Structure formats: C-alpha cells, structure tokens
Curated annotation (Swiss-Prot):
Key word Zinc-finger present: no
Keywords annotated in UniProt: Cell cycle, Cell division, Cytoplasm, DNA-binding, Septation
Main location: cytoplasm
Gene giving rise to this polypeptide: noc
Origin species: Listeria innocua serovar 6a (strain ATCC BAA-680 / CLIP 11262)
Protein name as catalogued: Nucleoid occlusion protein
Keyword flag Cell division: yes
Amino acid sequence: MPFSRLFGKKDKNQMDDIVEEGVQRVLELPMDKIFPNQFQPRTVFDQDKIDELARTIRIHGVIQPIVVREMEPDYYEIIAGERRFRAVLSLKLEKIPAIIQNLDDEEVAAIALIENLQREELTPIEEAKAYRSLLDMQDVTQEALAQRVGKSQSAIANKMRLLKLPETVQEAVLNKQISERHARSLLALETEEQQVSLLQEIEENHWNVKQTEARIQEILGVKKSVATKKTKPKRQAISRDVRIAMNTIKQSVTMVKDNGMDLDFTEEETDDFYQITIQIPKKK
C-alpha cells in the first residue's frame, strides 16, 4: 500500500477502510504478546477516560478489535486501538480481539498521527513531534505535509517552533501546566535561561497570556522601567529604540528560517552603528 494513500485520507471512514483492507478474520491474541505502537504520538493518556472505557468493556466486551502488525513470530505491535488495549490491560483480561495488518513503519506512523488528529487528543508538543517524525521519515516539505494532513503550512511551522523551547518548557505544555499560547510567547526571549525563568514566574503567579506577554516586553526592554530615573533620558530612549529594532529584525529572520528559507545572518557592532548583513542565495 503506497504511503501517500494514507496521507490523502481525511475522513475517518476512509482511514478505517485502509486499515481494514484485506482483513480476513478477527483473532483473539494474548495480551502479553502485544506491545504499544513505537510511533504513538500521544504520550499522555487520560486515566479517567481509560477507566470509563474499561467499565464499558467489562459489561459489553471489546466491540471494535484493535489493529496490530506482526513484528516477530507471535509478537505484535499496536497500529490502532491503544486506549482499548490499556483498558483491557487494567481489567487483567488474558486476550483481546485483534486484526492483523501488514504495514511498514511510515504507514503505521501516519495512521497513528492522523487518527489522533481526527480525535483532537494530542497536546501541541505531541503534535509537533509527530510532524517532525513524519518529515524525517518521508523527506517531504512542510507544505506537502500540510496538504496531506489537512493543515495549513503556517500551522505546521508554528507547531514545530515549539520544539525550539527547552525540555522543561515542553514538559509544562505536555502536562498542561501552561497553554500553547504561553509557550509560543516564550519564543520571543533570546535565551533558554530567560525562557525557563519566565516559566517559573508564570506558574508561581498564575499569569494569563496577556500578563505573560507584558512581562516579556519588560524583559526585552520595550516597557519603561518602574524606576523613574531621569539621568540621560534621551540616551536611554535611543538605546531602547535600538534594542526594539534589533529584536524585530532578529524575530523576522527567525520566522523566515522557520518557513524553510536558507539564509545567512551576521551582526557587527562598531562605535557608531550596528551593521546587519542578510544573505539570501539565489535559486539555481
């Protein structure tokens, strides 16, 4: 089955048709012979929802079989249905109904991503890592990936920018300690130390996004200091304006790079001025 077929499907029923293509029968497989999907983009599972599903399975059984592929003789990897698998595991049942499919790594990764996107259950970090994994495996552009998963190219790029944040910040998003908008605002800061430090302030003060952005502007020197020192006010204003201009240029360059353009950025400071050189190679 061509990998492109998976990316071309946006309707859940169409995805189910692909997963179940060529199915001959449902088997009862031993639970201890099944292991989770190595390409599962979701790393955080809602235990309450799994417990609720387990209660339903206890009464009605597993109505929809999981889908697996055989990795070694009598050992299987889950392709779809990990929540059902976890629910059955919590019930300490010995077997689970399953359908065996022959799919390669790229197809399995695509199914796992699209299935979760359709259910809107991924955190922003999980989604970003899934995009990166698919880009690495398939060697496609962000634009091509966006078309195949039904997203805009800018949405893909913005999600993947979150992976530039320190692991501590990514974990906070993953665990829903801060929102995606909080995390995105932290990208304006220049160092990881600043980002981690501000994360601590956000959590300690329970700041919303607007308050966080205001604090970032203070850090970047856009807002006037609380202190009202009047020594050399003109020089301070000019210095502040220069910082604003420099930060604006740097952020613009970063945005262009994130959108896939290859360019070189150099910065030089003299006694009289800052010199910025941007080189964009001509396409041959």
